[in-house]
Swiss-Prot record:
Substrate of transglutaminase. Specific glutamines or lysines are cross-linked to keratins, desmoplakin and to inter involucrin molecules. It comes from Aotus trivirgatus. Residues 1-520 are annotated as: Disordered. This is Involucrin. GO terms for biological process: keratinization; keratinocyte differentiation; peptide cross-linking; response to UV-B. The lineage of its organism: Eukaryota, Metazoa, Chordata, Craniata, Vertebrata. The gene is IVL. Directly or indirectly cross-linked to cornifelin (CNFN). Residues 96-117, 124-152, 202-234, 252-271, 283-297, 304-347, 354-411, 423-437, 462-476 have a biased composition (Basic and acidic residues).
Amino acid sequence: MSQQHTLPVTLPPALSQELLDTVPPPVNTQQEQRKQPAALPPPCQEVPVELPVEGPSKHEEKHMTIVKGAPEQECEQQQQPQEQKLQQQHWEQDEEHQKAENPEQQLKQEKAQREKQQLQGQLEEEKKLLDQQPDHELAKSDEQLGTKKEQLLEFPEQQEGQLKCLEQQEGHLELPEQQEGQLKCLEQQEGHQELPEQQEGQLKHLEQQEGQLKHLEQQEGQVKHLEQQEKQSELPEQQRGQPKYLEQQEGQLKHLEEQKGQLKHLEHQEGQLELPEQVGQPKHLEQLEKQLEHPEQQEGQLKQLEEQEGQVKHLEQQEEQLKHLEQQEGQPKHPEQLEKQLEHPEQQEGQLKQLEEQEGQVKHLEQQEEQLKHLEQQEGQPKHLEQLEKQLEHLEQQEGQLKHLEQREEQLELPEQQVGQSKHLEQEEKQLEHPEQQEGQLKHLGKQEAQLELPEQVGQPKHLEQQEKQLEHPEQQEGQLKPQEQQEGQLKGLEQQERQLEQPVFAPAPGQVQGIQQALPPKGEVLLPVEQQQQKQEVQWQHK
């Protein structure tokens, strides 16, 4: 009976064996799929996956033992739920693994799952139909089932190909999990690479700063040159044409204040650039830092410039006074103006004080020379030293000029070198013929003496030429010395004579003028009262 029962079942066991032989490959393919992710970066390997590998072997043993005397339907019914469970487990695991990988893969997997579910539904319907069909139709249905199962088996192979393609795409697209790990690595690498990049940027910035500091050094040289020019402008010979130049200097001072703000900004930037051991930093930066450590010196220089501006304004006032004196010289000298000038001896005293202040300025120039020497020691720059040497030579020339001017002032104070002596003497001889004009002449002489005490009046070149001509003729000078000494005596007694001019004055003859002048006491003698002098003059006229 067993043989008769087994004879019709010979074909189905072959099919069942084929099914049993074909079922395990999905497990192997899925194992291969799980082995492939091992090639992925470390973040992708963290997903733990455990596969029930021993399951298929047990099922195979059971099916092999049951096939001996079991019908075809029982084998198929036992195999189908087990296969479905295994496939569902694998699908769920694949879904979980793929969800962690990429959302695009999830969509593709969902489509594949839908197709599988449709195929499974079709298989179940066909199996139900097979249960109802007779045995002769089982062969055809088994063939159809085999083809469909082959399709099912081929489907995971397609999935493997798709997974490989996706893995290749992932190698280009970098999954977010891989990206996190790679970003960390990149951040570490960038942390090492950012230093040279930052250093390069800093070097460029430092080069720009060097250019700015060189420009500032040039401007400092210009400022020093301006200081020299301002010092030169303190000299009375260089008082003209300064107002426009002063406006330029004020603009330059404003520009210097802006540069001070830039220097402070650069110091702030250097404080921020505290990276250790910058690559290839020039040695020039150390020198620049040392220079920036002394902003107080720059402030002191600016204060000196401001003080010099005040001095320049004072010089402008002196220029206006000189212009006023020029206008007065060009106008005819009336006795009323002369009286007003004699009434203000305080102005003359103020002018003498100005001369003393100028001498103090010369001393200040010497102090500034010492400061320049000190700056030379601090800076130690050859180009700047050459400029300073030129400046010192120029200052020495200026000192020589000042000494020469002082000598000229001393010469002008001497009575032997009075300005326009010959012309004034002729005018005085003509005016002495008229006793009414003696008062105006005396006042005029007082004004001349006051003007001779002023420093460097306009028109000195003409007077100097006259003096040179006079020096060429010493005989004339000897003849002129006597009346000059007499004029000095007259000037000293002007104030006393003005008070006593109410007494009558006798008009001398034209030839008697020189006798009157000789009657006056020479330089250094004591003057007698006005009445005694007049009596002497009357006696001399009577004798003549």
